[in-house]
Amino acid sequence: SNARNYTYCFDPKVRASLWVAYPLHSAYTSGSGNRNYSDFGYDPKVDDELQAALGRGSYNGWYDRGHQIPAADRKCSQQMMDQTFYATNMTPQQGKFNQNKWGVLEGRVRNMICSDTLYVVTGAYFEGEHDSSIANKTTDKSANNCPTPTYYYKALLRTKKGNTGKTINEISDANQLRAIAFWLEHADTGNDTNITAADCISVAELEKRTGFTFFPMIDDAIEAEVKRAAVPSEWGVN
């Protein structure tokens, strides 16, 4: 299929994508895709030598091959699920963090799916990335250095009602949209699964921290207002 699955911003300096952007809807989260039939491997759209070598196992140390777009977000077909196992979608993620707090956040995001499309950007922030001084690193199975992210984030955008039948760029009233971002320190969080308001920031603040501009499809006249707002309770977070 030539349908777009997701979009990523790959940085060969860290052998990982700085962000992965994708639409989310119930059409994507149900179907025949089965992760038991998916294999970790290279992304055919990027030179192999630029990617982490993950086909023979995970990163060395206590790191999982952490998905940015979760496999569970692409059950609609085996092909789309398989693509979530490409190395360009992976980062070295602390095992406890991945399996507990981050995994809970991924599930929370799926619970925010509505009839209109939910737009998601998942990202990894590497402190020191721009001056090549990233202190924390691991290696892959080919002994390539793989920096470990300092923070992970998710940015979300959808309509408030969830059933408008409109695309984002058709909406000219900021009160019809809601946006938020989650910013989590990448650490061994043990069995902690709590997502709280302290983990939430505005999309505008996320843009300041990362240097990226998210959700360009928002009408320019309302973009700033939408991105400044961040109401955790609207997203089931206290």
Model regions and ranges:
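Short, His- and charge-rich active-site/binding loops that engage polyanionic ligands
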Residues: 3-68
